């Protein structure tokens, strides 16, 4: 058993370390001043073989990534997996990981004094639309935990903006179901995160599909919150997301 555990550690750790090193060394530090509010973010440019305009990929981190250092957000589960998927599939893309400030959350639903930061993310997206000529039919939104909830709220507040989305372990509390119909969305929860969350997402997914939307949901067997947010970003799910193009 000790030999098996050692072998498992050897096999898993290099993969995790390489993803972490890639995200820290490949994503350039950037910031944008928006009428007194500084939006800090990291950005990677992925150059595929195609000459087509780049897709824009936005990742929203979880609660532990909040701050002002423009680094804590890079610990977000899934960043490395998304980046490596884009690279290995030769997808021209700008991948942006904004940092939510300490006093905010993406959706504004984390506490009584909480301030939503998604409007600034939308303005960051608009900046790249006007300044870089990205492919506006291929803007993708992904996030985990607090960022998963942020995904749902951005789909709610800005329908028609995104080609597709993936929300890992984040709920859609307070969202207007009709607004969510515009965007194909894949969501996940771990089974150890609770039946209430899973049942709510099953109900929402069924409603969206019944009313002309496109939604998928998977309950990840035996996984707790931290495990589920890491396991959500598989190649198969990312393939589903990036196969979509806004009509």
Please report, for each region that a protein language model flagged, where it lies by residue.
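The conserved beta1-alpha1 loop
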Residues: 60-62, 189
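C-terminal catalytic histidine-bearing segment of alpha/beta-hydrolase fold enzymes
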Residues: 184-247
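Primarily recognizes the serine-hydrolase "nucleophile elbow" in alpha/beta-hydrolase
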Residues: 130-131, 137-181
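Active-site machinery of serine-nucleophile hydrolases
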Residues: 56, 63-118
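Gly/Ser-rich "nucleophile elbow"/oxyanion-hole loop immediately N-terminal to the catalytic nucleophile
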Residues: 47-52, 104-145
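Bacterial Sec-dependent N-terminal signal peptides
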Residues: 1-23
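A domain-start/cap signature at the N-terminus of enzymes
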Residues: 17-56, 93, 122, 142, ...
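Alpha/beta-hydrolase
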Residues: 58-60, 168, 220
């Amino acid at each position: 058993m000790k030999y098996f555990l050692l072998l498992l550690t050897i096999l898993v750790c290099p993969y995790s370390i390489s993803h972490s090193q890639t995200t820290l060394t490949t994503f350039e530090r950037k910031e944008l001043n928006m009428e007194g509010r500084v939006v800090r973010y990291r950005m990677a440019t992925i150059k595929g073989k195609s000459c087509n305009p780049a897709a824009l990929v936005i990742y929203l981190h979880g609660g532990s990534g909040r701050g002002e250092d423009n680094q804590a957000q890079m610990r977000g589960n899934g960043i490395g997996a998304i980046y490596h998927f884009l690279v290995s599939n030769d997808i021209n893309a700008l991948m942006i990981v904004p940092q939510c400030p300490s006093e905010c959350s993406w959706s504004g639903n984390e506490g009584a004094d909480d301030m939503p930061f998604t409007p600034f993310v939308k303005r960051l997206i608009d900046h790249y639309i006007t300044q870089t000529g990205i492919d506006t039919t291929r803007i993708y939104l992904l996030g985990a935990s607090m960022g998963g909830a942020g995904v749902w709220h951005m789909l709610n507040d800005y329908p028609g903006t995104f080609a597709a989305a993936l929300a890992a372990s984040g709920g859609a509390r307070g969202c207007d179901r009709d607004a969510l119909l515009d965007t194909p969305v894949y969501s996940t929860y771990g089974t150890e995160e609770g039946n209430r969350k899973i049942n709510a997402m099953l109900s929402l997914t069924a409603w969206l599909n019944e009313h002309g939307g496109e939604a998928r949901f998977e309950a990840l067997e035996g996984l707790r919150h931290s495990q589920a947010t890491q396991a959500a970003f598989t190649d198969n799910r990312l393939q589903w997301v990036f196969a979509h193009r806004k009509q």
